[in-house]
Amino acid sequence: MIKTNSVVVVGMGFIGGFLLPGYKMLLGDRVATDVSVIKATDRDLEKLRAEYPFRITVGNTLKVLREKKPDIVVMCPPPAEIPVIIKDTLVPYFNEARAAGIPLPDIYTFGPVPDPQYYYDCLGPDIHCVKYLPSMMETVGGVHLQKYGGSFLVFTPGDPFPPDRRQRAIDFSDLFGRTFIIPHDQSLYALAAKNTAHTLFEISYAVSEALEELGHNTSTANVGAAMLSLYREFMGGGRVDVCEGSLKEVPEAILPFLRGVTEAWYKGILTYIVSVGCEEGLARDFHGANFESLLCTVRLATRKELEESTANHATKGGVNEKAIEVFMACFYGPLRKAARLHMEGGTSESFYDVAEGMAYTINQTVHRHAYRLAGKF
């Protein structure tokens, strides 16, 4: 791999720390000296400094860029802050670097927006920018799920990256998921699909609560184990080597219900992805990777751990928050009620049609929300 001398990271929310394995891949034992992270405020500053090996400072991005002359700038602030950071910090630094003959850093931007083309429009055609949407799967119960979920990588049309720097960008992505290189528009509906599938967490909450109300000691992990096994049954296989499911941890009577809901949720999301123009083979590939990885997460984690993970990933106003908001408003109550009715012998097969339609509708809503976010740039 091409040598990386220095990395500057703008933003220290969850993603800034989550990328630590990537910094280590690029820099090895030089992370402490050659990764510089800049926060917007001093909130939790000392806590973060104690937790991470790299230097963390506040509000001095331009100064750090001038000092470090990085090979890579990682952009992971809230999307709304990006235009100001580009105007007040990146534009002057890139202009100074050009005038001094200093090589321009590659820009790795994280989040659904902006399109990498926005950076080219603001900074000039001689830059190199790539957008990352990592799978965000985590290590749960000692099982490393990171590389099994779908990660999306977006280069600009024409892809001006030199081959060695392009490969470095891909290698960085591969650490955090199974990489799919797709255009910006496709990345928005791929991300919407993943975040709709993320509501598998909330499905497990609703079914677990319904069973608990009926006197069954059934955790979200038990529900996840059954859904994972049932998913693999109707898909004809899966990554059993990564995480095993089980049909024996829930009351046998709930299995037909879980089978119907799991299959409906998978199909509703897939139908939406294909409806907006995605080639079905590609859609099945990345959707299946995310769906199974999320079911593995539900199977391996406690409810508290799932809720903590969601709190870390659900950016205020973002696509994950939107998926959960719509699910909770429109389907959580009906799903709990249907699970109870099924156990009492009263569920209609039509409920699964409703579930499939709801998955489609949530995906559509989240996709449109992603476009509204993109429209701000």
What does each model-found stretch correspond to?
Residues 41, 112-114, 133-138, 186-188, ...:
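Glycine-rich beta-alpha junction loops
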Residues 19, 52, 57-169:
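Rossmann-like NAD(P)(H) cofactor-binding subdomain of soluble oxidoreductases
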Residues 51, 118-127, 145-301:
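Internal alpha-helical scaffold of NAD(P)-dependent oxidoreductase catalytic cores
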Residues 1-5, 33, 224-253, 260-377:
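NAD(P)-dependent Rossmann-like dehydrogenase/reductase catalytic/cofactor-binding core
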Residues 7, 15-21, 44-47, 60, ...:
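Non-catalytic structural scaffold of enzyme domains
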Residues 1-72, 175, 209-215, 274-275:
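NAD(P)+-binding Rossmann beta1-loop-alpha1 motif at the extreme N-terminus of oxidoreductases
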